[in-house]
Amino acid sequence: MGVREQLERVAAYFGFGVDDDYYEDEEEEERYAKGSYGNGGRTGEPSPAVRRLGRSERSSAFGTSLGDLFGSEGPERGRYAHNPPHLRAVPDQRPTRVSVVEPSSFNDAQALADRFKRQQPVILNLQNVNSDLSRRMVDFCAGLTYALDGHIQTVANRVFLLTPRDVEVSAEERKMLAERAFFNQL
């Protein structure tokens, strides 16, 4: 038996490929007509020792079906279907400190991303940075906030606030951070 035949048998077992059950009746009729069934002199009856199992018979022969494996018929799977467990989120009560980053090169982007990944809001001050680095940092931060479901807001001219998912910065805090970033340039 070749590799192709083995792959076809495996595919047929799992329900892929051509459904041979459809053609089986025609083949059996041809075999009976030709008398090529070797059934020990009996006519009209196939040999009981060898027969092909259909899909439903195959699943019952092995004690399971694909519906049992992947469906919701099992008792464990249906346990929470009607009464899901009661879970409640506990808010994090720790005060979150906002960090200010004033990059001098694009290498500072990694430190910014590490802080952001730790769910820490970041102020990005690009007021003293050349336009090429500023553009690269804004593009990086836009991708970072998108990938981690965060938000990016303009706080002042060339000053941005990056807030992680599920973190809020109050309006007063934003205003204070913008003033702090503005006075840092003096």
Swiss-Prot record:
Keyword Metal-binding: no
Subcellular location: Cytoplasm
Transmembrane regions: none
Record's GO cellular component terms: cytoplasm
Source organism, top-level taxon: Bacteria
This protein's record includes keyword RNA-binding: no
Coiled coil stretches, renumbered: none
Gene Ontology biological-process annotations: division septum assembly; FtsZ-dependent cytokinesis
Keywords: Cell cycle, Cell division, Cytoplasm, Septation
Region: Disordered, residue numbers: 24-91
Quaternary structure (record): Homodimer. Interacts with FtsZ.
Function: Cell division protein that is part of the divisome complex and is recruited early to the Z-ring. Probably stimulates Z-ring formation, perhaps through the cross-linking of FtsZ protofilaments. Its function overlaps with FtsA.
Family named by the database record: Belongs to the SepF family.
PANTHER family the record matches: CELL DIVISION PROTEIN SEPF
Protein name per UniProt: Cell division protein SepF
Species the sequence originates in: Rubrobacter xylanophilus (strain DSM 9941 / JCM 11954 / NBRC 16129 / PRD-1)
